Amino acid sequence: MAKLRNKDSTENWSHKNDYPIEEVWNTYHTLARFIVPRLQAFKALEKHGYCPDFKGMREWNCAIQKMIDAFELMKYANTYSEDEKRTIEQGLDLFRKHFFNLWD
């Protein structure tokens, strides 16, 4: 996606918004940095159950780890190897599919 840079709009950004322009330009990095520690905490939580799509807690935690791995890769990098792209795709697919199961 091409960035449209208007000097007036970027100079006064922080005066008009509650977050830095860099967090908006790199929204997926920002979201990944926000999501990773929460998924890690959720995985470590002594949960009372697991997503019904999985056979047990171990399998559910494995899926959560795949989500974590995907977001870890997306926290800072801009380019990815083919293996990293597959890891990201798999983790994001799991995150999307099981988003509403991320509760206890």
Model regions and ranges:
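Long, non-globular targeting/processing and low-complexity regions
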Residues: M1-D104
